[in-house]
Amino acid sequence: MRKTILLPVMWVTALPLGDIASPPLVAATNEPFALARRQMVAEQLSGPGRNITNAGVLAAMGRVPRHEFVPKPLRSMAYQDRPLPIGNGQTISQPYIVAFMTEQLEPKPTDRVLEVGTGSGYQAAVLAEMTAEVYTMEIIEELAQRAAADLKRLGYTNVHVRAGDGYRGWAEAAPFDAVIVTCAPEHVPQPLVDQLKEGGRMVIPIGRIWNQELVLLRKRGGKLEQHAVLPVSFVPMTGQAQEQPEGRSPKAAGTPKPEPGRMQR
């Protein structure tokens, strides 16, 4: 079912109750959460002890209204550096992990990006501020429908939402310049590799729960160059990912040990 805008030890937790686009008109300087959003960027992303330096990422995070992607009772906490529940056992990632993964992806204004794990739609909105087209997949249909409605309401016309199993990717919209995955399979899904352009980038958490690495992949000469960024813990990828034999993963070159780190989703 295709719906076009109808619709990160870093520890990740699931809490109970998760052509170039013009910026939407939702980030007016006089809207009530604008100050909180500016403080989030200055203190949580680029402040002391933080390492987000990509100006495009910081600008996008300063425009996207995170409070619009969390349940109304939690909006007062929307700009705290923490994950928040969004229903269906899922969370919206803490702002820092969104910024970190986006920076690792190196998005460009002409990119067409695939996101696996729409969740609230917040990550897709950040990517939409920086790229030409975002195709995002969510296996929980209720979340996909809600995210699509919110993204449409906020003016993100370059985001396309599909309810379905992200393990398979979005073949008819491929190839993609970049792929970002916000749930953890035990290996890199081959369909996502096949749908990645030559020279394309992928950011994905890989491994079993409590033993995962955030990995940056680049496709060169039909092969994957792999760099482990740091240990993470994300919610497992469900669907077809859970049906795959152990050890199946596309061949990758270079798998250095990651440095220790911590993060939440």
Predicted regions mapped to residue ranges:
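Positively charged n-region of N-terminal signal peptides that target proteins for export
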Residues: 1-4
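Class I SAM-dependent transferase core
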Residues: 24-114, 125, 130, 145, ...
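Bacterial N-terminal signal peptides
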Residues: 7-19
